[in-house]
Amino acid sequence: MASLRDIKQRINSTKKTKQITKAMEMVSAAKLNRSQEKAQSFLPYTDKIREVVASIAASDTDVSHPMLEERPVKKTGYIVITSDRGLAGAYNSNLIRGLLYTINKRHKSKDEYGIFAIGRTGRDLLKKRQLPIISEMTGLSDQPTFNDIKDIAKQTVDMFADEVFDELYIWYNHFVSPIKQDVTEKKVLPLTDLSDTKVSTTYEYEPNEQVILEALLPQYAESLVYGALLDAKASEFAARMTAMSAATDNATNLIDELTLSYNRARQAAITQEITEIVGGAAALE
């Protein structure tokens, strides 16, 4: 049975841990609010570009672009967004598990796909399994700007344009609510799902639709990567906030249990002392 000193040390240690997890929960909540605001403010930009592209694609003019056309798939590119740090519950593991399942189901060899890893945790897990990582990016800030990922986003789009890849997907955790984040696979290229986009305005283009399309499509594809990153950041902070909240609750329960054990042990020790005193007094009579 643990001594009173041991139990007291465990109580103090758990209280310190609780202070840390509570602080991390509050920090994550603040970062979540900022990330949500940033992700929401970026949506109108991507929505408007998508509307313009859809308007051109649906027009009667004879315009075309490789990014709008499907071709036989020989190689697939995957952009995988995870976090640099842990303590976020199953945020990273669920995504990597889903990605590996899809890759094993979709491809027969490593020559059929390549991975762009954003985030240290995912990169390390994928490297451990010796998967083909073409490019990686770690150390992004909690509130990343487009310039932070411009190079890797442009690289993925350029490799599709150069037909290194015939299709490009992005994997990330989509923010649903502070307690729910969904592993999501979104097709970035080719853009074949524009028909369901509502076009609310009639546009006139200068110099012509083809020139506008060639300028907008790469920007739109790159913006999809950045938008997914902002969404993933919000999901990361939500997952970490939830994980730290659960850890704080567990610490509270453990402190209650240890305090009860301490009081019982202390009561038993006092009872034992009284018994010994009474027994000693009786022996002297």
UniProtKB/Swiss-Prot annotation:
Keywords: ATP synthesis, Cell membrane, CF(1), Hydrogen ion transport, Ion transport, Membrane, Transport. HAMAP family: ATP_synth_gamma_bact. GO terms for biological process: proton motive force-driven plasma membrane ATP synthesis. InterPro entries: ATP_synth_F1_ATPase_gsu, ATP_synth_F1_gsu, ATP_synth_F1_gsu_CS. It is found in: Cell membrane. The gene is atpG. Produces ATP from ADP in the presence of a proton gradient across the membrane. The gamma chain is believed to be important in regulating ATPase activity and the flow of protons through the CF(0) complex. The keyword Transferase does not apply. The keyword Membrane applies. PROSITE patterns: ATPASE_GAMMA. It is a peripheral membrane protein. Belongs to the ATPase gamma chain family. It comes from Halalkalibacterium halodurans (strain ATCC BAA-125 / DSM 18197 / FERM 7344 / JCM 9153 / C-125) (Bacillus halodurans). NCBIfam families: ATPsyn_F1gamma, PRK05621.2-1. GO terms for cellular component: plasma membrane; proton-transporting ATP synthase complex. One of its GO terms (molecular function) is ATP binding. This is ATP synthase gamma chain. F-type ATPases have 2 components, CF(1) - the catalytic core - and CF(0) - the membrane proton channel. CF(1) has five subunits: alpha(3), beta(3), gamma(1), delta(1), epsilon(1). CF(0) has three main subunits: a, b and c.
